[in-house]
């Protein structure tokens, strides 16, 4: 479908606005995936706080210009589906990774996080980032274990002191 200049400008403005508030971006090729499967992916994306859109490569290059996602420019070849994680940096990567497992034709091209390009082979780095709640739980369990260990060492020192006396 041919887009006039105003439509192109509107697309660039909309996606640029989303990119400004995004934590990470993931680029994929969805050729060969059925419409039903893509609809499921979009629904799961909305629930996970992920903005997804198929955008022409020339327009996408304009969108990422001057942003932390500029490193993705070289991956804009062929049909490009871009997903921006709005709430958690690993949300889009996790979503695409799970979807790619179930759909062989879906191919993750690359991701970007804090200005760093993450190739498709290393997408797990981003997908396995813990959520805020998970990170907090890990920290609390580590602190709890450290306190218990200190108590045990203190009691052992008191016991040793009593035995020596």
UniProtKB/Swiss-Prot annotation:
- Biological process GO annotation list? translation
> Is the keyword rRNA-binding in the record?
yes
Q: Which GO terms describe its cellular component?
A: large ribosomal subunit
GO terms for molecular function, please?
large ribosomal subunit rRNA binding; structural constituent of ribosome
Record bears the keyword RNA-binding: yes
Keywords noted in UniProt:
Ribonucleoprotein, Ribosomal protein, RNA-binding, rRNA-binding
A Pfam family cross-referenced in the UniProt record is Ribosomal_L10
Q: Which domain of life, per UniProt?
A: Bacteria
Q: Which Gene3D superfamilies match?
A: 3.30.70.1730, 6.10.250.2350
InterPro entries xref list: Ribosomal_uL10 (IPR001790), Ribosomal_uL10-like_sf (IPR043141), Ribosomal_uL10_bac (IPR022973), Ribosomal_uL10_bac_type (IPR047865), Ribosomal_uL10_CS_bac (IPR002363)
Classification via HAMAP family = Ribosomal_uL10 (MF_00362)
Q: Its quaternary structure?
A: Part of the ribosomal stalk of the 50S ribosomal subunit. The N-terminus interacts with L11 and the large rRNA to form the base of the stalk. The C-terminus forms an elongated spine to which L12 dimers bind in a sequential fashion forming a multimeric L10(L12)X complex.
The similarity comment for this entry is: Belongs to the universal ribosomal protein uL10 family.
Q: What does this protein do?
A: Forms part of the ribosomal stalk, playing a central role in the interaction of the ribosome with GTP-bound translation factors.
What is this protein's name?
Large ribosomal subunit protein uL10
**What's the source species for this entry?**
Pectobacterium carotovorum subsp. carotovorum (strain PC1)
